[in-house]
């Protein structure tokens, strides 16, 4: 602010910034102000504050007014525009100053004027021309528009005060521009902060208006106290300079005002506001304020205090007024006498004096225009006088047309009278001379006045400064910063500086920069608004005295002086303005002293009154003022439209801007000076302090309709002319403007031409921004333009005169008119071009600023969003930590509780054991040993006994110890609570390491325990991963509800409070010792080279595929290949999926029973009406009834089931149902639509019954219809029923099925089979309503379904296990709250259940599974120990087993489980116990094998079967189980693994036995036999011997050992020892002659040795011996058919069937007899007497399945293909054993294959065959229960694979790949099929596809080792080394204990040249989880050892 902004382009007279800011100010007005206005609706202070959406007219309004803070708006558009233009240039600073003193500078971006340079008020007035008339008019019009709105509050006062007063209510933020000062500030804000200003520190948000006070706060926030003081001093200096300038300006202005008494009269009224301010200030610093008048220092609110005019001042002003009135009268007289000439003369005087002045005054004028707006009030009353004067002037001008016309008057007249003729050359010269003289005179006057003012000001300021400096020194000496701040604020407040503009210019700058923020705030605090309003009459009050732009700045200062920091003394810079500002200021000063007259520029008495119209801003509040303005605008618009000459007058306005430019003072200096000046007035007028807004006595100003006349800037053609004159002499233009306003009022009816904002924004009006030289040049140009304008005006006057008086000739008028027209056009074009350019520049600068602001805002928004995101993340993290900490606290508390219990128990036990020890010493050492052994062996039982017996009287000592321990533990509890976080971190790290070391056994969802149905709560999958419990707690499931706390609050814990004895100490010790002993040594013996050798010997991909697929296809039944076109097969595969059912629908004989209604017996015997729902209904037979509807009411609107209302017939439907039996009766056909039939039925009924329809009941009508139907059909009773199915019948409307109607079906199906095709005719039935789930309750709530009820129930009946489980899972599945809370709630329930049922293994199993999700590994182990201690049960041991993760732990639990089972078996033996023993034994063996311990596995199994010890496991096994155990042993010897038949092929982890069927060893060749054959046979013999139960019959014994015998026979056969095999078979058949397995084995031996006759003889002999044995005959039939001897079967078939009948059956054929035996309905009825009764029901029931097989198998031999198909379909419809169904299907498929192969229409037959295969795969179950378990199932695809492989043999090889892929997609978990597909891809050399398929199978079947190995081998073949690492990692997660995988990875790493460290890490990981690699890496020794075995 130190230097004013350098003048902008000469055109605008403003720095581009300033222009932009001006424009911005306007924009700020428009945009920002609109925003701000909206914010501070009533804060229209300053134009900027004006709430109007777009008040561009006066920049001052925005920039100046608002900038003026206090007075700017009060001085209305003129002052505002002056301020705007003026402030744009150097007065941007003044504007800032104005803004500053009055209230505060709005942020720079929004300031329309340069913030930094605050010119003294005088300089302001000078430099900133008043807003153009049009601008002021526009503002006035805007105000008029918004007059009724709240922002009207921003009338002249609010304008003058800024938001401060009205608009500036503290609550409302001023427009962006800020408060009253916002205009300036906004302009400044738009500009870059003036350099002199130290970077104004923008406080975060725009200070509320109150920040006027807080402006200091702002400084304080951003600047140090020292800085504040320094800036404060600078401001004081600036204010002193401004005061001096003001004094000079005021003195000169007073003279000018005296010259214009009339104008002053009018101005006095209007400017009394401003003048009163100025006057008061002038009293204080009269000369200074006079100088201030020059610049119309709206901001220098110093005069605000003066605003309240004292009587003496008023007299003085009146005197001045009187002096001024003569001047104005004089000029008026001149105008009237000479018409335009008088005006020209006045203008000449004004132009010379006031043109210079007006140029200076243009600033003044513009600011005075604001005052003029106030004067509009005076205009109202004076308008009549002005009209009279105007008439006189017109007359005089007519008379003087011939005389020489003063250029000044002419210019002004021309401005107003656009028709005036061009002034002659002589007139121009005279005008110029007059102008020059007037200019010189004015300058002299100004100099004198300035000298006086400066002297006075200096004295006053010196005193003030001394006082301030003393005060400042005191303040600086204070040590307390707060006290310093308070004192400093007091000091500033005392000076009446608005805090927002604290003396610190930097602060002001910052305010300027933050117009919006600081502006708003300051204005809110601005109390000066009221003062400003009071001082509206004062010259200094900017808004009130629009004529005094200089005062405007000054007034605004004075006005806002209440704002301590805002009061600025007129800056000395004003002195630089004097030439320009003096004349103008003089006029202003004159107007200031005579408060009533607006301070017109020097000698414009008549026109000054016109300037008062500009004050409309002052009276903006009043509607009259607005109306007047509006009228004026109308007139101006009309004149603009109609008078082109007016445009030429626009050329003049620029001159005043030049004046303004000539004295631009550095913004900073100006602002500082103005601040200082203002501060003085404030000090003098304490009433203006911000604090309470003192009522302004001047508030009651005469209300005149304001006419906005922008002297300099008036853009309208008319206003421009006036503006030019006003520029030359501010008031000259006003006079003509006022006259125009009068005309406008008279022409109110004329259409309004809205003022153009462009002209308002014309920056050319502010020449103050120009340098001095250019300013002078500008003035000269202005004078020249004024002379021309005057000539033009004279001509126009002459035209007028000639038109009115005949003295003037038409020719002269025409010539002059033409010239005027041409000149006007040229001027118009030039002015338009200039204005548009200026507007363009302004808009560009505005755009630039807006873009910058947008970028800043975007950045701030981004930052805010980033902060929000960060905070949200922090919040979530904190919540997580909180939850985890809570959880750990609970765990610690539980641990402490447990440990306390253990401690007490152990102490008691210690006492007991001590006593026992003492007793034991007395016993012999042998006894002691025994006891020790007993303790070791039966520790747990002993402990349980101890536990059950209460502790006997513990001693006092132990009680004390317990108490001490308790205290210690409590202390520990507290410490633990503190260490929770650390513990958690440590545990998380440990868990992470453990995860890295040992992959999780199962990748299961974190926690999704399905609620088990109550009958099966043991199905839940066990989660073996106990290392991630902490995480699981938080991730449990998304659908957990906030759990109910009622039940839990009473005693919330997650572990049962069981008084259990110490866990088996001995067992734990044994376990530990065992683990340490068994831990293998680190494998470091082998070198990398050896490992690489082993890797090279490893199985290749081909070997792997061959190994895994051998045995899969060995016994596949091969069919005949059907050669069909490949394209068809491909298409067929698609159709096959769509249409699976080729057979026609089943016809039920019951479907015709509804026609019974047509029988006469229906009514006579049944006595039923035809409407009976039993017969007349719309029931859909394939649609379920709604069970809710059946048992109550169904409230589900979308229920898909049938309801009573759905199938009950209405009256119309009943008639339609009856008529549907003969549609032709009603004229319809079968093809008719429902609508047609319905309509026809209604017509028929209507026609039939007619009038009687309403007299008959429904049943009577129905009876008549029935008789009609019978007659039409020709039926005679009683034969009236219908056998044919109706083509149409009424059906109930089925609700549309929603998309998710089948979701429950899919959710419920847990099976892996998902068939790709959907049957075409499948009915979309909703989910079967099999089980009512807890969420399924619609209408009846089971009492136990509600949690509260369940809680009550379990408390009443605590031993009800199912209720406890149901409640626990209720809590677990709650949808509220967190998952961990739900889990804890469920655990709490189960813990309570265990307290009441601690011996219930079912509860323990559920509890352990849930507890494993939250407890640590140690905690879970401890709870498992507790479980098996309290509830030792097979299931609880299995749960324990699955929850352990390492080999040692699992092996230990398995060993204990075997001991437990053996102990139980000693007491009683049972099949289930025997199976459990076998399963536990084989699990342990499998665990050892899986972890690489084949030798130990073999030893375990061997010891279990034939140990020398008495108590071997085999003793407790049933014969069948013992036989399986021996088979497993032999299989292990031979293949180093257990039989795969026992286990689920898709899960290679150690698991439970799923299948106990016997099997044959999978030897393929002699080489496969590893063991010595004789030794192997000896083992078989041992096995048979061990499995033979002598108590059984021979046949039973053979059958029990049959699996062993069949394997012995197979071994003999493999070894090609056929004779031995045959001998064995025959010997066995002697005891079991009809054992089909043995018979088949013998036949196979004969066939292998090509003894077909003997083979046939075997079957024939067996059949002859057992003619009624259907099983034997079936096998015989199969044999004959396979031998292609089917034709030979018929006699045997007859013989076989005859065995069931007595003689007499001969007349019946075989099929009829079979139908009779199988109870198949047929055409012939066979008497029952012919059937033999020589077989009992049991035997016959055993035979029936084979009878069906024989019936189907032999059917093709005796009947057609169609009947054979029907026979197979009938057989499949009979409920039979699964194995029989499979045999029927295989026979059926073979039949279909043969049929298709031999058919001519292969395509159709193959389609039938394919559909049949699909049906078979779909209908045959693949889910089988695990032995002795009804809850656990496994998927057995063995039969499905046989069917698929058979189908493949019937399909061309080219289709195998697609077929296999399709079946794999249908059965994704079918491991056998997956391996077959991989084998096929390998055979086709599709390694890439093989790799992809294998990788897919690793996801579908994640626990199948074979697929992992093939996938890895494929990657190795394709060199995908990185993928190999990933596959190993994934595989070991699924199969963590698989030694084979670990070995492969180790060898792979070694082959890759892996580092030794990596290999050692692998080995150490293996050791950690208990995997042994020793045997796998020493395969030779393993082999020899196994052979030795």
From Swiss-Prot:
Residues recorded with modification Phosphoserine: 15, 28, 34, 128, 251, 352, 383, 662, 714, 717, 719, 805, 809, 948-949, 953, 998, 1046, 1301, 1303-1304
One of the GO biological process terms: RNA processing
Principal subcellular localisation of the protein: nucleus
Superkingdom classification of source: Eukaryota
Keywords: Acetylation, Coiled coil, Metal-binding, Nucleus, Phosphoprotein, Repeat, TPR repeat, Zinc, Zinc-finger
Lineage of origin: Eukaryota, Metazoa, Chordata, Craniata, Vertebrata
Modified residues (Phosphothreonine): 766
Composition bias type Acidic residues, residue spans: 20-32, 527-537
UniProt cross-references to PANTHER family, sorted A to Z: ZINC FINGER C3H1 DOMAIN-CONTAINING PROTEIN (PTHR21563:SF3)
Biased composition (Pro residues): 594-616
Modification type N-acetylalanine: residues: 2
Protein name according to UniProt: Zinc finger C3H1 domain-containing protein
